[in-house]
Structures are given as structure tokens and as C-alpha cells.
Amino acid sequence: MANNDEITTSSHASPAVNHESISRAKQRIKDGLATRRSWRVMFDLHSTGLPHGVSDVFSRIKTNLAYFRSNYAIVILNVIFFSLIWHPTSLIVFTGLVFLWIFLYFLRDVPLKVFRFQIDDRAVLIGLSVITIVLLLLTNATFNIVAALMAGAVLVLIHAVIRKTDDLFLDEEAATTETSGLTSHPSS
């Protein structure tokens, strides 16, 4: 009987750890998606217009890429996903790679260790990028993948150039100051 109690106790400890890991993973996903900006803000027609010069183009690209980076990543991933619908093998590989990215890069709380060596986040990013590119290119959907990446990049750059940056705040302090009414606006 004592052995059964010990086995039961040890088997109950495992689900608690799994539940804790799942809760932590859910929180990290929520935190990651929290950086996504509202699609209404992203596609606000009143905030679009042509830039006034080359410096304005580069300024808008820099600001919009920083502000909408999660949205842009979602757009590019969707373009790639839809381009792979006609290549089921590539789509399966792509889905597996998404899970690999989620667990090895995005949901990792502690530094990755291999054979007692700590792996830097930059090395993980580079390694996962190389693995992703190599595996997807080996699935004979090279043209579709490259075309989808190019189409996604063009869409992102077009949006980044025509989206005005006057109403975007990259830091919390500026957004708080603006929304609290502490800034003065000239009356018209």
C-alpha cells in the first residue's frame, strides 16, 4: 500500500508541473500577442498619405516597423501559409517549424543549454532561421516560399511608407503623457 501511495503521489506531481508549464506558456503567448497593435489603428485611412521626401520615407519605415512589428510578422506568416496550401508537405513542415519556434524561442523562460553550455538568444535565432530556410527549401516549394516572402515584404514596406507616424507612440511614457492630457495642443 505504501508503494501505491508513493506512486500515486509522484504521478500527481507531474500534472502539476505540466499545468504550471502550460499556464506559463499561455501567459507568454498572451504577452507576445499584447505587442500586436490594433488592426484598426494599422489600417486607419485617415492616417495614410504619401511621404514628403526620402528622409520621411526612411523615418516612416523605421517607426512603422518598430510599432507594427507583430502585425507585420502576422501578415508575412499568413502570406507564406496561404502560398503553401498547394504544397501540403511544405505546409506540414512549416507548421512543425512554427511549433519549434514557439517552444525554442518565444516560450522559453530560461536560457537554452546544450551539453552544459548556455546558448545565446541570437544563436538560437540564427540557428532556427537557418533550419527553417533549409527545411522549407528542401520541400520543393522554393519558388512559392521566396515569392511569398517577397510579396509579404512588399506589402509591409508599402504600408510602412504610406502610414503616417504622427499618432504613433513607441514608448509607454509618451503614450501616457499624451493620453493623460499633460501635453498642450495649440487651439485652432
UniProtKB/Swiss-Prot annotation:
Disulfide bonding pattern of the chain: none
Protein name: PRA1 family protein F4
Family note: Belongs to the PRA1 family.
Cited function: May be involved in both secretory and endocytic intracellular trafficking in the endosomal/prevacuolar compartments.
Record's keyword annotation contains Transport: yes
Biased composition (Polar residues): 1-13
Any Gene Ontology CC annotation: endoplasmic reticulum
Subcellular localization, as worded in the UniProt entry: Endosome membrane
Keyword annotations: Endosome, Membrane, Transmembrane, Transmembrane helix, Transport
Membrane topology: Multi-pass membrane protein
Organism of this sequence: Arabidopsis thaliana
Native organism taxonomy: Eukaryota, Viridiplantae, Streptophyta, Embryophyta, Tracheophyta
Gene: PRA1F4
Chain segments carrying region Disordered: 1-25
InterPro entries tied to this protein: Prenylated_rab_accept_PRA1
Principal subcellular localization: membrane
Pfam families cross-referenced by the UniProt entry: PRA1 (PF03208)
Regions crossing the membrane: 67-86, 90-107, 119-139, 142-162
Any single GO BP term: vesicle-mediated transport
Coiled-coil stretches: none
